[in-house]
């Protein structure tokens, strides 16, 4: 069983939603948390909650779309916290737009944050983890990588890319003390799923079927005690993915029939 007490855990996208809940949960369990996001005020509010149980936790304000600055960010975090034992790549942005309306600029911008940024962060922390022969990289994916919903093709593609990169790390790091895996949330009750500029309105879903950020945070913590590559945030998400993987064509036929007419 992995023990979080005293571990240095870095959480990106920690100013709200899953990231904030994850940071607070690790702090509650005794980890020293490094909170990374762009929004200083919101980060400060989450830091206050973390410091109630983890007084040495710190914030690092950063724009993760600036890939050239990521090595420097990691150097600063290590200098402040001492080392990084666990990296939770949670930061992400939505892109809700039909494929026929997506621009190359749309695709590039969402790929930069959702895929290239966690790749760059993973590559930046790997050398020190390999030297210590210890560490965890947890990349937060999405059910969108397993069942593309209407109007989120560009977003889903970024999460599928992240899963395959992480899968390669998982295999290549076998036999070392460094581990990489993904956690897959479905629809979550957070601002990520609300209306945003530059996006079509969120697809309507039953809020009773959505997970809370705290449920996802608990799944992230639990995944560190498991050797599996993929952890679904809820049993329902896992069952949906299993159904899709059992017969992708039948699953997509059913989805296409249910959504027929929305694309007109």
List each model region and its residues.
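SDR active-site lid
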Residues: 171-236
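Conserved glycine-rich Rossmann-like NAD(P)H-binding loop of the short-chain dehydrogenase/reductase
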Residues: 29-46
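Substrate-binding pocket helix/loop in short-chain dehydrogenase/reductase
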Residues: 98-99, 103-108
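Conserved glycine-rich cofactor-binding loop
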Residues: 8, 15-16
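The beta1-alpha1 cofactor-binding region of Rossmann-like NAD(H)/NADP(H)-dependent oxidoreductases
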Residues: 61-72, 104
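Active-site helix of classical SDR
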Residues: 122, 158
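Residue(s) in the substrate-gating loop at a strand-loop-helix junction
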Residues: 142
């Amino acid at each position: 069983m992995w023990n979080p007490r005293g571990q240095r855990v870095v959480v990106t996208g920690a100013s709200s939603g899953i990231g904030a809940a994850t940071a607070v949960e690790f702090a509650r369990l005794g980890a020293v948390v490094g909170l990374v996001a762009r929004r200083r005020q919101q980060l400060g509010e989450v830091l206050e909650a973390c410091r109630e149980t983890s007084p040495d936790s710190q914030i690092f304000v950063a724009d993760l779309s600036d890939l050239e600055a990521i090595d420097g960010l990691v150097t600063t975090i290590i200098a402040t916290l001492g080392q990084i034992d666990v990296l939770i790549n949670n930061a992400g942005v939505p892109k809700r737009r039909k494929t026929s309306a997506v621009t190359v600029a749309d695709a590039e911008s969402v790929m930069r944050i959702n895929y290239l940024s966690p790749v760059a962060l993973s590559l930046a922390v790997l050398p020190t983890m390999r030297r210590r022969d210890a560490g965890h990289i947890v990349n937060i994916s999405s059910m969108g990588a397993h069942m593309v919903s209407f109007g989120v093709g560009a977003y889903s593609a970024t999460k599928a890319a992240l899963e395959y990169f992480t899968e390669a790390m998982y295999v290549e790091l076998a036999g070392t003390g460094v581990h990489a895996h993904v956690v897959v949330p479905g629809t979550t009750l957070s601002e990520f799923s609300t209306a945003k500029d530059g996006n079509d309105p969120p697809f309507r879903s039953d809020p009773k079927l959505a997970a809370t950020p705290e449920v996802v945070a608990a799944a992230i913590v639990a995944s560190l005690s498991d050797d599996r590559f993929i952890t679904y945030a809820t049993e329902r998400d896992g069952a949906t993915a299993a159904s899709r993987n059992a017969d992708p064509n039948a699953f997509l036929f059913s989805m296409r029939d249910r959504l027929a007419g929305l694309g007109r």
